[in-house]
């Protein structure tokens, strides 16, 4: 403290000296020299931490989750994981941070959103931007050529968050990917089927899945006169068509990205089209587009994809949309994105997209970027945007004023008289050992009314009540919280009766 006080006095004196020199209109060189001394003293002094008010909050773009929010999240995750497992996926995990070199050059214009870490050892690190690039690195490192995997974990982006709309800097992704050499479009169709199954199961509203193909985009841009160097940057402009008008997109391409107006008009003739398999067939006959080998390959695969989607019974949920041009650099084939739709009444006329909730595509070259010999492993996958889904489900539950249980407790062990703590402890231990989710209140002599109220507030369905008479008779009084019906159950039959009432399997092995 004494040392700091001495420094503060020196800063004060030096400040007075600088002010005096300025009043005396001393030479600029002398003033500059004395100002430098003042700044040096201030740097030594550092900030006065005692005067700084610490604001207790989470970092920008992040949030805490309450027990209620976590209960909603667990339900959403459960739907997603059950679907992934139903389709035969294995689960993996990767580090939350990667070598910076691993992530750079994989995301195009979005690379600027990657979080960099300062490591004391000098290693250049970054927080993962998504789960796909780490998966490709994992495949190359382990020399894997065939796997169906899912991965649920947090990713990080230095984006400008809109937290009310489910956009954050730290958020979960739920990914499903199929790696390996297979016949065309079968894995791609399954990914779209999974996407539709999950969105239907979550019951968050009507949705539409837009599909396109990177080869069609590249072929279309080539025949329209876009140079190779502008392919990716024009893609990012076209991809905004779901949010802004064609005129605004055209102005950006011409004004900001230097595209000739006639080239932009030719692009506009294509990217404003959307439809089903009939549009695919129409474009296969397009005299200009058919000059591109890339575009023809993409259209041929999309035609086959629609055949499989019809067999899966989801073709009515899919729209071929030429404006879909997702910005990630690593996509090489089919790309897709699911959007929630407003109803015609909400939208005014036709259904409109109100936000992306899932996306994915084929990335056949990404693993080869990490393999020392450049060996490619074809991959296709999808990612569920769960943060937006959490927000939608939470809003729906609030609107319905629906109570959400935050625990899974099946039974509360209660007592009707005093001095029965030991008996409650013995019984709750028996229930835990039998795999029953049970609780008791942490009081020696709780009132029965307080115990019953706790069950109602927490949504616990059953109460196992111990009394002196019940102990003499070798029974436990089992009470239903909702119906208030009570029955005496022999102690040795209690576990079986609770499992029967709660629908829990009798064997936990």
From Swiss-Prot:
The chain residues annotated with the modification Phosphoserine are 66, 356
UniProt-listed Enzyme Commission number(s): 6.1.1.21
Q: Does the keyword Ligase apply?
A: yes
Gene3D superfamilies per the UniProt record, alphabetical: Anticodon-binding domain, Bira Bifunctional Protein, Domain 2, S15/NS1, RNA-binding
State the Gene Ontology terms under molecular function: ATP binding; histidine-tRNA ligase activity; protein homodimerization activity; RNA binding
Q: Which SUPFAM superfamilies match?
A: Class II aaRS ABD-related, Class II aaRS and biotin synthetases, S15/NS1 RNA-binding domain
For this protein, the record's HAMAP family field holds: His_tRNA_synth
Which proteins does it associate with, and in what oligomeric form?
A: Homodimer.
This chain's protein is named: Histidine--tRNA ligase, cytoplasmic
């Amino acid at each position: 403290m004494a040392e700091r006080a001495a420094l503060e006095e020196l800063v004060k004196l030096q400040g007075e000296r600088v002010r005096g020199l300025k009043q005396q209109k001393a030479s600029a060189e002398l003033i500059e020299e004395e100002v430098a001394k003042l700044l040096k003293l201030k740097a030594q002094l550092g900030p006065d931490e005692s005067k700084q008010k610490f604001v207790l909050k989470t970092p920008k773009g992040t949030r805490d989750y309450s027990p209620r929010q976590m209960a909603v999240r667990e339900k959403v995750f459960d739907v997603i994981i059950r679907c992934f497992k139903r389709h035969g996926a294995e689960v993996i995990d990767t580090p939350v941070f990667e070598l910076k070199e691993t992530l750079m050059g994989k995301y195009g214009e979005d690379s600027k959103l990657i979080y960099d870490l300062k490591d004391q050892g000098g290693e250049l690190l970054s927080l993962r931007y998504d789960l796909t690039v780490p998966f490709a690195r994992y495949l190359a490192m382990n020399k894997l050529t065939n796997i169906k995997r899912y991965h649920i974990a947090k990713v990080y982006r230095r984006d400008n968050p809109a937290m009310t709309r489910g956009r954050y800097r730290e958020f979960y992704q739920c990914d499903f990917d199929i790696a390996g050499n297979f016949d065309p479009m079968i894995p791609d169709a399954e990914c779209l089927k999974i996407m539709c199954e999950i969105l239907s199961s979550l019951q968050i509203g009507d949705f539409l899945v837009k599909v396109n193909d990177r080869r069609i985009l590249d072929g279309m841009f080539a025949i329209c006169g876009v140079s190779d160097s502008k392919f990716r940057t024009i893609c990012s402009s076209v991809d905004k068509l779901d949010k802004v008008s064609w005129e605004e997109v055209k102005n950006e391409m011409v004004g900001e990205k230097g595209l000739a107006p006639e080239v932009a008009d030719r692009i506009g003739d294509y990217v404003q089209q959307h439809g089903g398999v009939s549009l695919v067939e129409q474009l296969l006959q397009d005299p200009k587009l058919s000059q591109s080998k890339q575009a023809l390959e993409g259209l041929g695969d999309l035609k086959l994809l629609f055949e499989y989607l019809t067999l899966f019974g989801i073709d009515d949920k899919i729209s071929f949309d030429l404006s879909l041009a997702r910005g990630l650099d690593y996509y090489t084939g089919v790309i897709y994105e699911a959007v929630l739709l407003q109803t015609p009444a909400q939208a005014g006329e036709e259904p409109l997209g109100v936000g992306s909730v899932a996306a994915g595509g084929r990335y056949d070259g990404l693993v080869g970027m990490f393999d020392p010999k450049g060996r490619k492993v074809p991959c296709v996958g999808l990612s569920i945007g769960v943060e937006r889904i959490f927000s939608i489900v939470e809003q729906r539950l609030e609107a319905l004023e629906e109570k959400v249980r935050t625990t899974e407790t099946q039974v509360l062990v209660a007592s009707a008289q005093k001095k029965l703590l030991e008996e409650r402890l013995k019984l709750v231990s028996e229930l835990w050992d039998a795999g029953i989710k049970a609780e008791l209140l942490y009081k020696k002599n709780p009132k029965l009314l307080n115990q019953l109220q706790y069950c109602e507030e927490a949504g616990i369905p059953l109460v196992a009540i111990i009394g002196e008479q019940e102990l003499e008779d070798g029974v436990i009084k089992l009470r239903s919280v909702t119906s208030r019906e009570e029955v005496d159950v022999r102690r040795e039959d209690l576990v079986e009766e609770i499992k029967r009432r709660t629908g829990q399997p009798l064997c936990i092995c």
